[in-house]
């Protein structure tokens, strides 16, 4: 089957995205002040190229071939609306009349998405080693439509200064590690 995106609602409003960025930078400044920031924001002192692994894995013992699908990619065409360009020169992305261009990769649980979520059979893992620089949990996680509800998320900064945003996570399922803690590539988030 196919699901058609209805209204191209961004995952986060501009205000929510700005709040996340502000929280990230406040945490980075706090970690820096406490001499706990593992990665410098000074380009000269950053590490080399970071290679990413895949952020979703099936739980141990699950006999499915896999537990994910992709519904949308980053929109690399800054024009809008309906000016789409994904990484493969295709149009598997979206934008909106407001000027929003999709800024992430939408990975969903499949097959039986709710069952996989309810039984914790799909796991979100770190794509690369890094430091947790923000996280938020306890938000509603059972939306059946595309919206911009506040999400459950973990944000990890890597050696090159890049920051991976892991959003739309199951409420109460986030790692027990705290802001400032280190995670390794493939570690449960």
Question: What are the functions of these language-model segments?
Answer:
Residues 117-121, 125-126, 158-188:
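Short histidine-centered loop motifs in beta-beta connectors
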Residues 106, 155, 165:
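Conserved beta-strand positions that form and line the central face of beta-propeller blades
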Residues 1-152, 185:
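Surface-exposed, glycine-biased beta-strand/turn segments
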């Amino acid at each position: 089957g196919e699901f058609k995106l209805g209204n191209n609602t961004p995952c986060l409003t501009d205000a929510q995205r700005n709040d996340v960025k502000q929280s990230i930078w406040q945490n980075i400044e706090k970690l820096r002040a406490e001499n706990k920031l593992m990665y410098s924001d000074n380009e000269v002192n950053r590490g080399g190229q970071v290679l990413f692994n895949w952020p979703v894995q099936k739980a141990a013992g699950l006999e499915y071939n896999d537990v994910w699908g992709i519904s949308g990619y980053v929109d690399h065409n800054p024009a809008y609306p309906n000016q789409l360009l994904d990484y493969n020169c295709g149009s598997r992305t979206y934008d909106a009349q407001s000027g929003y261009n999709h800024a992430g990769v939408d990975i969903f649980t499949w097959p039986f998405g709710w069952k996989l979520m309810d039984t914790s059979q799909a796991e979100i893992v770190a794509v690369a080693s890094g430091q947790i620089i923000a996280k938020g949990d306890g938000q509603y996680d059972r939306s059946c439509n595309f919206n911009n509800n506040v999400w459950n998320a973990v944000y990890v900064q890597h050696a090159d200064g890049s920051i991976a945003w892991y959003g739309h996570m199951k409420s109460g399922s986030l790692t027990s590690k705290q802001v400032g803690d280190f995670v390794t590539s493939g570690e449960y988030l």
